[in-house]
């Protein structure tokens, strides 16, 4: 509870005092179970579903969130801003960023830049997904094929990039 929150804040402060930054690994692309607060709050709004009713599982780990829907995007953005403001997080590594949409990732980058200065907070992620996802409409995902649509201060890495560099 409360003690753990204080301990985490003290840990981050000590890391900063030692001259290091803190990058938080975030998994916003899916939830483990459909028995979530998202589903309890607004059934099926926060999740991607294929036309046949199958819940999208592009992460191969759970249920894909619909980042292209406004309230889902708002939740993710406000969560990132909260961690940054309240805990002084220096950056974020987005797990399976390729399941989140380009507009949301650029919006996160823009908000962090407005509050802290251009590129002062680190953003990078995995520009891929394990499986196909049921993204709505013409929304573009923050996947390898759309890297050029992301803000220049959003980094990406994956096995194929690593292998290309290694040769």
List each model region and its residues:
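Active-site-proximal helices and loops of the catalytic beta/alpha 8
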Residues: 18, 96-167
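Substrate-binding/active-site clefts of carbohydrate-active enzymes
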Residues: 1-87, 97, 101-116, 122, ...
């Amino acid at each position: 509870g409360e003690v753990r929150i204080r301990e985490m804040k003290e840990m981050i402060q000590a890391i900063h005092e030692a001259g290091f930054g803190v990058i938080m690994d975030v998994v916003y692309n899916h939830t483990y179970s459909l028995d979530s607060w998202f589903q309890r709050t607004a059934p099926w709004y926060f999740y991607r579903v294929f036309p046949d009713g199958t819940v999208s599982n592009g992460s191969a780990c759970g249920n894909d969130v619909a980042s292209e829907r406004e309230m889902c995007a708002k939740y993710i953005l406000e969560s990132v801003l909260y961690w940054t403001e309240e805990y002084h997080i220096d950056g974020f590594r987005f797990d399976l960023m390729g399941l989140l949409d380009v507009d949301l990732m650029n919006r996160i980058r823009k908000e962090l830049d407005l509050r802290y200065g251009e590129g002062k907070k680190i953003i990078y992620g995995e520009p891929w997904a394990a499986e196909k996802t049921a993204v709505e409409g013409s929304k573009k995902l923050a996947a390898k094929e759309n890297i050029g649509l992301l803000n220049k201060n959003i980094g990406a890495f994956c096995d194929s990039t690593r292998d290309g560099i290694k040769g």
